[in-house]
Structure formats: C-alpha cells, structure tokens
Design a protein with these regions (language model features):
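Gly/Ala-rich beta-loop-alpha elbow adjacent to hydrolase catalytic centers
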Residues: 15-24
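Hydrolase active-site cap/lid region
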Residues: 30-77
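Catalytic histidine-centered segment of alpha/beta-hydrolase-like enzymes
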Residues: 129-141
Length: 151
C-alpha cells in the first residue's frame, strides 16, 4: 500500500478484499487523509489466519507457534496488533463493511466483529454469494458506489 501511494500519490478511498481488507485497515490506522474505506470479506484475527493456513497445508500446531514467534521477532511486532477488530477501535473514517453469510473462506463473524468495534462503520451482509462471487454482485457494486459517492 505504501509503495502504491509513493508511486501514484496518496489515495483518499481504499477498497480491499479478504486479507487485503485487513492490510488496508491496518494502513489506514495511521493514515490521515483517508475519506472512505470499503472492506469485502475481511478476515479479523491474525491468529485465525495462521490457524487456517497451518490446517490447510497439514502442518502441526507447533509450527504455528514458531511462525508467529518468527514474525513477531523479525519485525518487532505483536501479531495481535494487526487484528482488524483491534485496529479499527479508534478509526474515524466512514467505512462500509461487506461480507456474505455463506462465505466458506472467511466467516461472516469476522466482519461482524470489525463492525462492532468500528465507531464509523456500516455493515452489509449478503446471502448466497460466498467469498468471491460477492465481488461481482450488482447489489454489492451499487452499494459500494453509493457509499463512495455519498458526502
């Protein structure tokens, strides 16, 4: 995100999907000129992301702990500080949070948690679109456009 901003200039609207939503929320935690944020199918807790990765590739729980420690030590961070529902607690940028209740990749509860913690968020929950089809659904597209165009 920083690289894109350095190359093209600062954006004032950010739209992200899945893990990209989490990255945008973390970036916007420190950004001052952001006017609107849209997340679609966002994850929430980094621990869950790591758990799902470990499970999907068939690794052991011990590996998860090693990965977590590696990232925390290498980048001098607390991995929990990257949880989306944590980074939005002080967010004052109007945000639209979109998620499908039939998303099999990332549970809708992630976006519900983000919405509960975000003081300026609107939540849109859809049905029957899943994690990817939601991106091309006309109702979702119109909602996102309306949200961005609203003053």
């Amino acid at each position: 995100i920083k690289t894109l901003n350095n190359h093209y200039g600062e954006f004032d609207i950010y739209i992200g999907h899945s893990l990209g939503s989490m990255a945008i929320l973390k970036y916007c935690e420190q950004a001052s000129n952001v006017k609107k944020i849209v997340t679609i199918g966002s994850g929430d807790q980094m621990r869950t992301i790591f758990d799902n990765f470990i499970t999907s590739v068939g690794l052991k729980f011990k590996t998860l702990e090693r990965m977590k420690t590696y990232f925390q030590d290498k980048y001098n961070i607390n991995i929990n500080d990257y949880d989306a529902s944590y980074v939005v607690r002080q967010q004052q940028t109007p945000s639209l949070i979109v998620h499908d209740e039939d998303d099999l990749d990332i549970d809708v509860s992630c976006s519900v948690n983000i919405h509960k913690q975000h003081p300026k968020a609107t939540l849109m929950v859809t049905k029957g679109l899943g994690h990817r089809r939601i991106l091309r659904d006309e109702k979702v597209i119109h909602k996102v456009i309306s949200f961005i165009q609203a003053s």
